[in-house]
C-alpha cells in the first residue's frame, strides 16, 4: 500500500497486537449536498476497505463529520436557520447519497460537537507540553517551531513555508505558520466553554482528537482527498505526535486524486463549480456513477467533462461506464446461477495481484473484462454448463469486491447495439492490422453517422460511446 508520507509502497502489516487495522477517513463538512468530488474520495476509501476485508484483514473504520465550521455558519445565516439543523440536513443528505452509491457505512461517525470535551482536553495537553500557547484574545495556537518534523508529509521545508505564510500576524501569534487550535467566540456564533474562554475548535485539531479517542494513538490507515495533504493532514501529524510522543501517527496515508473539470480546474464547493451527485443521478444510475469512480486508480486525478446542451447534458466518463456495464451484463447473461460453488482461480489470482499492488482497480477491471470475454467464448462454443457457471460466478464475485453488482439494475436490454458495435470494431482492428486504412476509416465514419463516437487508444485498442 502506497503512503504519501514515504512516497513508496509497503506491505500492509497491522500496527497493533490485536491485528485489527485502524482506518480513519476525513469526512465531509456538511455545508451543502455532496458533489462528485466527495463521491470520488469516499468510493475510493470504500473500495480499499472492501478489498481489505475480502483479503481477510480485520478493520475498524471511523469517519468524522465537521459539523461546526465557518462555511456551515455562513450557509445557516444565508438560509436563515440554526447551524445545528443545517449540518444535520446535509449529513443526512450525504449518508443517503452514499447508500445509493453502495458505500458501506463506517463503524462510527464522530462529530466535532459530540467530541468537544475531548478536543479541549487535547488542546490543553498540547499547551501543557509546550507545543501550543494561548494569547490574550482567547485564541490558542500550535507552535510549529516546536515540532522539527513539520512538513514531512507534504515534503515542504520550514523556510519555504515561512516565506509563503508571511503576513501581518494576529495579536499574540508568534509565527505566521502557527495555526489555530481554539478560536475565541464571535457574536452570534455557537461557542463552548474552555480554559481559555468560550469559543470553538480550529479546523485541524478535531481529527487528531477524534481519531485518538475512537482508534488510539497510532493508525494503520488515514484517508482523504489529496487537497487535505497540506495543511490539514500535515497539522494532524504535528498535533498527534507532539501530544503522544509516538511515531508514526499514521503508517499509511491514502490520498485520493481530485476530480478536475475539463480545463483542469479542481471541483469544489468553495469554487462554486460543482455538480451534486443527486443531479448526476437524475440521468445516470448509481451503478454507472460508481463504475465511473472505480475505473480510475484512486490516487489519479479524475476528469469530469460535461457535454451537450442544456436539458441534455452528459458526462463522457459515465457514458463510457454505461457501455462497459452493458458488456459485463451481456456476458453474465440471464441463465439461472447459484453463487455457491467453485470459482475460476486464474481470474481470482489475477484480480488479487492487481488489487494487491496499491488497489489497482484499472488492472483489476482488465482481468474482469478478460473473464467476460472468456465467458462469451464458452457460451459460443457450447462449453459445459458447469464451466460457464464457474466463470459467471467469478464475474459476480470479483465485481462485488469493488462494490459493483451488475444484477442490481436489471439485465441488458434485448435491443442493445453494443454487440454489433463491438463486432464492427473488431473487424476494424483487423483491417488496421492489415494496413487497410481507408476501410477502417470508413467504418469509423459510418459509425459516427449513426451516433457512435470511436476513440483510438495508445496500443491499438479502441473505445466507443453512444452520443444520445
Model-flagged regions — what are they?
Residues 65-70, 91-94, 104-119, 137-146:
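Short, glycine/charge-rich beta-strand/loop segments that flank catalytic centers
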Residues 53, 99, 127-128, 254, ...:
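Alpha-helix C-terminal capping/helix-coil junction sites
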Residues 57, 131, 452:
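Short phosphate-binding/catalytic loops that engage adenosine nucleotides
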Residues 6-102, 459, 463-464:
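N-terminal, positively charged nucleic-acid-binding surface of large information/translation enzymes
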Residues 76-83, 107-113, 225:
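The substrate-binding groove and active-site-proximal loops of carbohydrate-active enzymes
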Residues 265-268, 273-468:
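Structural preference for alpha-helix termini/caps and helix-kink/transition segments
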Residues 1-31, 46, 117-335:
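Alpha-helical recognition segments enriched in aromatics with Gly/Pro capping
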Amino acid at each position: 500500500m502506497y503512503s504519501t508520507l514515504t512516497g513508496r509502497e509497503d506491505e500492509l502489516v497491522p500496527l497493533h497486537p490485536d491485528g485489527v487495522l485502524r482506518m480513519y477517513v476525513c469526512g465531509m463538512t456538511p455545508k451543502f449536498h455532496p458533489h462528485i468530488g466527495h463521491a470520488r474520495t469516499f468510493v475510493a476509501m470504500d473500495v480499499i476497505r472492501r478489498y481489505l476485508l475480502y483479503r481477510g484483514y480485520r478493520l475498524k473504520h471511523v469517519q468524522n463529520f465537521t459539523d461546526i465550521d465557518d462555511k456551515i455558519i455562513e450557509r445557516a445565516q444565508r438560509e436563515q436557520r440554526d447551524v445545528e439543523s443545517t449540518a444535520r440536513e446535509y449529513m443526512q443528505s450525504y449518508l443517503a447519497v452514499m447508500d445509493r452509491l453502495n458505500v458501506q457505512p463506517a463503524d462510527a461517525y464522530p462529530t466535532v460537537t459530540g467530541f468537544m470535551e475531548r478536543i479541549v482536553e487535547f488542546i490543553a495537553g498540547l499547551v501543557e507540553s509546550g507545543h501550543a500557547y494561548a494569547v490574550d484574545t482567547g485564541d490558542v495556537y500550535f507552535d510549529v517551531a516546536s515540532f522539527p518534523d513539520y512538513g514531512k508529509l507534504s515534503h515542504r521545508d520550514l523556510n519555504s513555508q515561512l516565506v509563503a505564510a508571511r503576513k501581518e500576524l494576529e495579536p499574540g501569534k508568534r509565527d505566521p505558520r502557527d495555526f489555530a487550535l481554539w478560536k475565541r467566540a464571535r457574536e452570534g456564533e455557537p461557542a463552548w466553554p474552555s480554559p481559555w474562554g468560550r469559543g470553538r475548535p480550529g479546523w485541524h485539531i478535531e481529527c487528531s482528537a477524534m481519531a485518538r479517542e475512537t482508534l488510539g494513538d497510532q493508525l494503520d490507515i488515514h484517508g482523504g482527498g489529496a487537497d487535505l495533504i497540506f495543511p490539514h493532514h500535515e497539522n494532524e501529524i504535528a498535533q498527534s505526535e507532539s501530544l503522544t510522543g509516538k511515531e508514526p501517527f499514521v503508517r499509511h496515508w491514502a490520498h485520493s486524486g481530485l476530480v478536475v473539470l475539463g480545463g483542469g480546474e479542481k471541483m469544489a464547493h468553495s469554487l462554486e463549480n460543482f455538480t451534486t451527485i443527486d443531479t448526476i443521478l437524475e440521468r445516470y444510475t448509481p451503478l454507472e456513477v460508481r463504475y465511473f469512480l472505480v475505473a480510475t486508480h484512486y490516487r489519479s486525478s479524475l476528469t469530469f467533462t460535461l457535454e451537450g446542451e442544456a436539458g441534455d447534458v452528459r458526462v463522457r466518463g459515465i457514458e463510457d461506464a454505461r457501455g462497459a456495464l452493458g458488456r459485463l451484463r451481456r456476458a453474465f447473461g440471464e441463465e439461472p446461477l447459484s453463487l455457491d460453488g467453485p470459482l475460476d482461480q486464474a481470474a481470482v489470482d489475477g484480480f488479487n495481484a492487481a488489487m494487491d499492488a496499491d488497489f489497482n482497480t484499472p488492472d483489476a477491471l482488465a482481468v474482469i473484462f478478460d473473464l467476460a470475454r472468456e465467458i462469451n467464448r464458452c457460451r459460443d462454443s457450447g462449453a459445459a454448463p458447469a464451466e460457464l457457471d464457474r466463470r459467471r460466478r467469478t464475474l459476480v464475485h470479483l465485481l462485488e469486491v469493488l462494490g459493483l453488482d451488475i444484477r442490481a439494475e436489471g439485465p441488458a436490454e434485448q435491443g442493445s447495439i453494443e454487440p454489433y458495435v463491438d463486432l464492427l470494431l473488431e473487424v476494424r482492428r483487423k483491417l488496421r492490422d492489415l494496413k487497410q486504412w481507408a476501410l477502417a476509416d470508413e467504418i469509423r465514419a459510418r459509425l459516427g453517422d449513426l451516433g457512435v463516437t470511436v476513440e483510438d487508444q495508445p496500443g491499438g485498442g479502441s473505445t466507443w460511446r453512444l452520443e444520445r
